[in-house]
Design a protein with these regions (language model features):
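A short Gly-Trp-Pro
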Residues: 1-143
Length: 143
């Protein structure tokens, strides 16, 4: 599987672990702030399954909490991976994959830190398939 940042300056490849891809959601404050989102979608992958294809020199590291390094693109700011140095796995940012990972989330951690305003399953939220060129939503999905 290949992934890239928003500006495409950084790209990577990751092979599926033999045991399958373990995907989770994290609602901790650190992930919410780092990703400017109500949660982060991650996959734990062995380091040996990951390699940079281009732009590794454009990555920067931020230690967001003691011992946790977040790697991001210095051009566009996209979060790429996180790691605890010395551990055998990396935390891949699933939303940056350029294809369907073929697995779905199996856990949601730090639910105690969820934001109260984000209930994307609520029937009160209108759903649209895309955003049109005129700046209007297109093809409302009522499901």
């Amino acid at each position: 599987m290949k992934g890239s940042c928003l500006c495409s300056a950084v790209a990577y490849e990751v092979s599926r672990p033999a045991a399958g891809l373990h995907i989770g959601l994290c609602s901790c404050r650190s992930c919410r702030k780092a990703h400017a989102a109500p949660f982060n979608v991650y996959a734990s992958v062995p380091r040996e399954n990951f390699r940079w294809l281009r732009g590794e020199d454009k990555t920067r590291i931020y230690e967001s909490s003691p011992g946790k390094n977040r790697h991001f693109c210095s051009v566009c700011g996209s979060q790429l991976v996180a790691e605890y140095p010395g551990e055998s796995n990396l935390l891949l940012r699933v939303a940056l994959l350029d294809e369907d990972p073929g697995a779905r989330p199996v856990e949601h951690i730090f639910r105690s830190q969820q934001v109260p305003w984000c209930d994307w399953e609520s029937d009160a939220i209108a759903r649209y398939e895309e955003w049109g060129p005129s700046g209007e939503p297109t093809a409302r999905n009522t499901q």
